[in-house]
Amino acid sequence: MGKGRIRVEERIKAETDAEMQKATLLDQTQTKKGK
């Protein structure tokens, strides 16, 4: 019963990390262009 919840939390964490990485890449490209 507890394993399913851990998997869901891991998936949410992975998605959050991916979104943060995407945002960081966007910030880096915008900074290089000088906005």
From Swiss-Prot:
The protein's name in its UniProt record: Uncharacterized protein YhdX
Organism: Bacillus subtilis (strain 168)
Gene name tied to this protein: yhdX
